[in-house]
Structures are given as C-alpha cells and as structure tokens.
C-alpha cells in the first residue's frame, strides 16, 4: 500500500526520499554512524551556504557538479565523528568516512553489493563561537579502471560562514578532478 504524503506524492511515486542512519555514541570517544542515503558527514557539507529555503540550485536544470562533494561516500558508509574539541569559545570538529563500495548504496537484504572500489572522506570545522566558522573536506575514491592514465577521483571543498543575529553570509568553493573522474568508478 502507498502512504499518502503532502503534495500528492506517495511512497511508491519516487517523489520522496527516506534516509536512515544508525548511530552508536561512545561518550568522549566519539560517535560511529552507519549511513544510508545522504547520511555521511562529507555529504552534509556539499553546500553549507546560508539559505532561506533550500540550496539556490534546487529545482533548476543545470550541469554543475559543485554540490557533488560527498556523493560517492554517502550511502553504505561508516563515519567516525570525533567529539568537538573546545578551546575557550572555539571548537574543532573532525570526521572520517569509509565506504567499502563507494558510489553504490548498500546491498538489499540477502543481496550482494555492486563491485565498486572503496572511498574515504575527511571533514574539519573550526567554529569561533562568535559567528565565524571555517571548514572543509576531501573525498577520494580509488580507481576501478586499469586503463592507461586512470587515476583516483578526488573532490575537495572549503567554506567560510559568518552569522550575526539575522544576518548570515558565506563563501564556498569546490574542486573535482574532472579529467580523471571518467576513469574512476
């Protein structure tokens, strides 16, 4: 049976997305999170800029890949999230993500996952405690190709945001080695 949702979408129409994560908190040792569908820490910083509704590119037709950071390690992966380290008002947050089958989601119950290579992602964020935050990350997927010139896929992003009362501004850049991306995965 289909579950009726807002705007006439049903659970079988493809008009909605469900994401589930399992988190194991270990106190001062941090958190381990098992990710399914956009759950990784890397995928969470694909677009960190302030927004009133959603990302500025939401609902548009485009070929931009700036928001693809974390997309290869977001489903079927495992995160380790270090507890925030505090230095007065400042804090430092670090994460590491491992995906044994980067670019593919986990296998269905009783199934076998596709044969993609592994990927890793790392993120860091420094929060000043006074509205300024600086962060970034790197994501790498090992090559699945033995073709001459094939190399690993690498994505990186960095951002700065500032909030003071109702005012929020930000700047973010993203890099992807597009020349090699076709040879990877």
Q: Model-flagged regions — what are they?
A:
Residues 1-185:
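Outer-membrane beta-barrel proteins
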